[in-house]
């Protein structure tokens, strides 16, 4: 975890867990591959495209700002 604040992946995981859904369910809701969600949450893809983040935000029912804030 960054000392500066939460990463996009950490924020995605936080909101996903609040909803009580798995990475698989989120990937289907966002129409993305499972490994895309897994890699972002794990930090292996620290800078996903804005389109990917928009899809995830919509699937989680949160704003883009909620996911990119630190």
Predicted regions span which residues?
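Alpha-helical residues within the helix-turn-helix
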Residues: 17, 28, 58
């Amino acid at each position: 975890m960054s000392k500066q604040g939460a990463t996009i992946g950490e924020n995605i995981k936080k909101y996903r867990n609040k909803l009580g859904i798995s990475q698989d369910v989120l990937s289907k809701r966002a129409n993305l591959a499972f490994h895309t969600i897994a890699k972002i949450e794990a930090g292996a893809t620290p800078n996903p495209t804005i389109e990917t983040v928009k899809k995830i935000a919509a699937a989680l029912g949160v704003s883009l700002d909620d996911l990119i804030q630190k």
